[in-house]
Every structure is written in structure tokens, then in C-alpha cells.
């Protein structure tokens, strides 16, 4: 096997790469299989041998080769589906072989797995998902054969097996302690960007961007370089996502990425110096085009760093010069004079000796036209007089900018002037000063194609968050000051809000800082509609802070912040969050923090919730039970009981119907306790005061009641008389004396009639009594007019 140095593990022999694997795929002995049963028996033998790590390593290597031979020679015999069913059984033994400590076994297993991945792709994803962590673990091995075998296996695996499980496994290595694993992850990200299908990439592109962002900030320089390559690949295929990623990093990273863009483009410049294709672009592929194109000499290219050359800019500059009309065509002798400088550019350059005296004098005359002359073609500002007298002013300016005498000598004054204008235009378009020796103006400017979603620079927010959690006191103080400015920005993204909320919660757990409390208040006022998830944890921190703070001044700041929360969030949402916090078994509150919570709940019920708001929910029920358990605690009873009683009174005053319905499900002890509390505190004080009765109205009500009672009594007496008349024998005889009833029923017994009359009288009297009681209750004078039901 040829030993080719892998690009992922630089230096040294005894390393393998992708070409070695491809050559070894078919380098196996032929194995014949006659049927599915025969193939199954052979696979059983393979599994039996490979599953024993103590088996002879030559036998295990042979069995790995047999797997490839069966796949190559026997797929037509037993069918693809049947073969795949047998191959999936090999997942465990192949993983064990990749994990082997002997390099020959590892290399052969990596070749076999890569062969299966290339041939079957996602159909063998079970094997790939099993072997990927093992292959990555081999990257940290110092033995180069083992490390490069594992690295090459990951290349085949990621390229041909495209599943979300594979990508999820890859993301775990972004925080690996081994730099080789992080570096290999960047290489695999290039493969994902280039080879995976767009439908699958669409859902994982944000994660790819985060991984690349992490890579370009890595501590290992080689990992950073691999991350920049992955960024360039992303830029080439998904430019919009690359622009978003570019905008999300800080200025130093942006400069590094722009330099990597220029370096990648200048690589083609360095490789194409003196080559025909690059010259053909500049000369338009014709001798006529070459006449007007100046020589980009090696001295000009050598004085610029490779990362500071933009091929597009050079092409634009030289093309603009080539379009300048020449007043006199060059002779054939001129074309024979070719520059053979080390740079290799072979553009024809005119010399004084080849043009003749007439041409030379014309050049001098044209170059010496005064700038104040009306007929001058020079549109540039007045220049100082030439001190050399040998070169025209345009050439001197170009020479001062480019520093190449061979280049300058090849230009006519018009060409030099046009080139100078092109250079000035390029500098101005890039926003750089006209006279500077800084090469940064040649770096390509990346313009995002889509506007940023947030007005705040993402890198600025991240930097402030990092400063707030820094161990340096000065940096942390500055970060907190900047945080107080950032929290009120209206265009923060949801992720930024989440990160800021976590930082504020962390700062609230430390020593009390008025700036932090003001930041929390501003944060809540500006973004309360999007902080429903933060509210519960934020309230817990505020209650703990209020309970532990001893200084009155700091307590005032805390109360101000809590009032901001009360006035900003929806009261129903606050009630739910407070109840969840109170019943949460994880967030245990100290006794003083419990008091702060009950005070907050009392203010919420009495001052911020509307009368009649429903609260008959399971959260409130659990909260009341929790509060009763707090009030029953003998150790903290004196602190908590008064505030718990206020909460109960507030609930009753808010909605008495829900309060009664809620307590119907409680045990009698709690109901009696609650009613005693309400009676002791006078629950009527929470309800609106009734109108004071006036004497005139009192007399009218009494008169109406008396009239109604008299009418009811008259009705009852008349009804009793009618019933008695109908049931008496005398009345019946009087009614029937004139004629004989043919349908008369036999007379009922007297005792039965008396019982019936008695029951009717009782029912009428009870109805009358209930009616009087109802009238008295509705008029509010039930206490003054008690009805004796025994009467």
C-alpha cells in the first residue's frame, strides 16, 4: 500500500489517505456464495471471529476482507435487500474492529466500513451511526496509521451517509478537548456543506453556522484555519448564510475572514503568475489587446503580501488601462521585445531604443504639456514640477505608488494617467484615503445581501455578556454598565433576550448592585411581552434578594424593581408564575423569601387584578395548600401567618364565588380555619360598603311587606274555605239535591279527607312562610323580621 501523507494529519510517513482506501476496496480474494443460506453461514462465521478480540489478528483481518468479497461477488446471487439484512448484523463486530488496538485490524476495518458506506450509503446507516464515535476516538491516538485510518473513515462516512443522527453526533465534538477531533470536524463540515442534499441541510444550516463560528474562534491555529476553509465553502454554496455568519462575529474575526478570502484568491494569482490563462484574461486573447496592457511585474507583486491581492481588483485596473486608445500603433519590432522577468509575465513593453527618435520626441512633448494650458488632456489637479526631467509627471506618480521602474517604463503618459485614475477610483470606492501605505484597502469588502434582523451588533451583545460573567472585577463592572444600556434595545432577538435574562438572574444571585436592579427594571419594561419564560425564575431571584437584604437603601431599590414587574406583566400571568414558583420542589425559599412572595401576592391581588377575576384553578388550589403548610410550621409561624391571612382575604375579596368553590374541595379543618380568618379580619371590609338605609325608605319597605303579607293571608284563607266547602257532606248534598249525578263516585272515608286537607294546609302555610322569608331576605331586613317556622 502506498504511503501518502494525509492532509488532515501533516507530516511523517506511515499515514494513509482516501486514495489508499479506494485502491484497497477491490484488493480481496474472490469468495463464492451459492445461496442465501450459504451467505448467512459465512456471515455467522465472520461475526463469531470478529466478536472475539483475543482471536488471532490475521484471522480477523481475513474476515474483514471476506466481507468486501461477499459484497463484490455475491450481490447478484442473493439480492440487494437480503444482503443488506445480513450486513446490518455486522454493526457490533465492525465497531469492535474499528476500536481494536492493533493498527492492521483498525485499518482493514476502516477500509471495509468505508467500502460499505460508499456502496450502500444511507442503507447501512446503523453501521455508520455505531462506528462514528469510535472512529473519532481514534483521531486522538498518537499512532499515525490509526489516527489517519480513523480520519479517512469519517470522510467516507459523512460523505455517503447523510442522516440527522450523524450530524447530531458530529456536533458533540465541537467542544472536544482534543484539537485533532475539532480540526477533523471542520473538514467534515466542508463535506456536509458540499455533498449533503439541500433538503436535509436546510434544517441544520443554523447549527453549521454555529460550529464554524466556534471553529474560527478556536485556540488551535490549525483548527482556525480549517474553520476558515469551511467558511469559504459555506460562502461559495450558501452565500446568504455566510453573510449572516460574517455579520455575527466581531471585527477581528471579520478581518481574518476577509483576509482568508483574499488569500484564497491570491493563491490562484501566485499559481498563475506567468501562466497563459491568467495572461489571456488580461490581454483579451489577442496581440492587439496586449499592446495597451502594461506589464504587472514581479516586483509589484512581490511588494504586496499574498493576502492583500484581490484578483478582481487587479483585473478591473488593468482592463481600464487596456481600453485607453493608443495614438500610435506599436511596430512589429516592439512586439519582439518581451519582458522575461522572474514574474513570468510576457507582455510586450515599448522601449526608447525600439520606438525611434520621432516617437520618443512625441512622448516627451505629450508628457510635458503644462497643466494650465487649456488644450491639456490632463484632468488632474496641478502638479509640482518634475525634479528628474527624465520621466513624465504621470509616470512619476505611478512610480511613487507602485515602486517599479520596469512597470513605469512600459507605460505611455496616457496609460500612466489612466492607471493612476483607476487606482484612485478603486481606493475611493473602497473608502480608503488616497495616500496610504496600508494594504488593507485591497482586502475585499463583504456586503451582506440581507439586512440584519437586529439593530444591535450581535458581537457587542455577546461581548457584554461575557464581560458580565468575567472573573475580572474591572471587566465585570464595565460589562454591567454596558448591560444597562443594551437591555432596553427594542430589536433584541429571542436568543439574546434569553441570554441576557440568564445573566441578570446570575447577577441577582450575587451581592446587591443598584445598576443590576435598574437593568432588570428596564429589561422588564422594554420586553415584558416576550419574557413569560423568564418571569418565574426572575421572581424567585427577586424574592430571595428581598429576603436576604439588610440595608434599607438597597431594599428600596428591590421594591422599585418588584413594582416594575407588577406593573408590566399581565396579572394573570404573574399569578400563575407565582403559584408555580411557590409549589416548585426545586426552588426552595427561605422564610424571609416566603414572606416577600406572600407580600407580592397580596399586592397583586389587591392592587393589580380586577374584581371578579377567576382563579379557581389547580395552581391556585395547590398554592393555598402550600401556604397552609407554611402557616402550620411552628418555627416560622409568627412571620408567615399574618401575610398568609392577608392573601386569603385578598382572594375572598377578589372573587367570593371562586373562593367558596375552591374551599369546598378542602378538608373541614382548612375550611373552618379560612372562615375564622375571614371573620376575624372582617371580610366585609373588602367588599363595597352597602348604602345606608334612610327612614323614609325603611317605612316604604315595611308598608310594602305588610300589604304583601295581608294579600297572601287573604288568599290562603279563601283557598282553605273553598277546600273545606268542597269536602263537606252538607255542601255536596246541597249541590246534588236538584238532580241526580250519574257519574258520582262513592264517598271517601272522612279520615282520608281530613288527612288530605291537613296536608294541603301545611303545604300552603309552608309556602307562605318561605315566601315571606324570601321577601325579607331580598330587602335586607332578615335580621329584623325573623319567622318562626314552628308557628
UniProtKB/Swiss-Prot annotation:
Q: Name one GO biological process term.
A: meiotic cell cycle
Gene3D superfamilies recorded: Leucine-rich Repeat Variant
SUPFAM superfamilies (alphabetical): ARM repeat
UniProt subcellular location? Cytoplasm, Cytoskeleton; Cytoplasm, Cytoskeleton, Microtubule organizing center, Centrosome; Chromosome, Centromere, Kinetochore; Cytoplasm, Cytoskeleton, Spindle
Q: Which domain of life is it from?
A: Eukaryota
A Pfam family found in this protein is CLASP_N
Q: What does this protein do?
A: Probable microtubule plus-end tracking protein that promotes the stabilization of dynamic microtubules. Required for the formation of mitotic and meiotic spindles. Specifically promotes the polymerization of kinetochore-bound microtubules. Also required for cytoplasmic streaming.
Give the protein's recorded name.
Answer: Protein CLASP-2
